[in-house]
């Protein structure tokens, strides 16, 4: 859960309002008690979560996920950290939902790319950051400031109207 003083809370709050959904604030202590956290999600019939991967990993690593719980959960969105593939696969094995990796550095104020996870990834594979969001352009440039070709390494540059002032 994003603190309200952090820019990411804007998308949490307003996307909930826009879709006519209910916004629940999960008591922070529940993240220390996975069974209580799952009970809360089930009791409230939560259908979408947008968490940092470390929160998702807590439930996966402690074996709190089963094929019998979280039946209402339809979307699992994650951002802010690298999602370990092993734990992502643990989620995908137990919870039938749409999974999406959302990427956006601080200067974009929100996400700039997304990847819908549509297959099981091998444990040594990285979760891709995906495609640019609407109103966003993503470029990869080499050290000589020329555009990188597919498969070439380089620096990720983002442009769009949502960049923070000064970028």
Residue ranges of predicted features:
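AMP-binding (ANL) adenylation modules
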Residues: 2-6, 30, 104, 146-149, ...
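Conserved AMP-binding/adenylation subdomain of ANL enzymes
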Residues: 3-47, 119
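Conserved A3 ("GATE") glycine/threonine-rich loop of ANL adenylate-forming enzymes
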Residues: 5-8, 47, 80-87, 101-116, ...
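A generic "structured core" feature
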Residues: 16, 20, 48-49, 59, ...
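Short gly/Ser/Thr-rich phosphate-binding loop of adenylate-forming enzymes
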Residues: 31-36, 53-66, 75-98, 135
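AMP-dependent adenylate-forming
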Residues: 97-101, 116-167
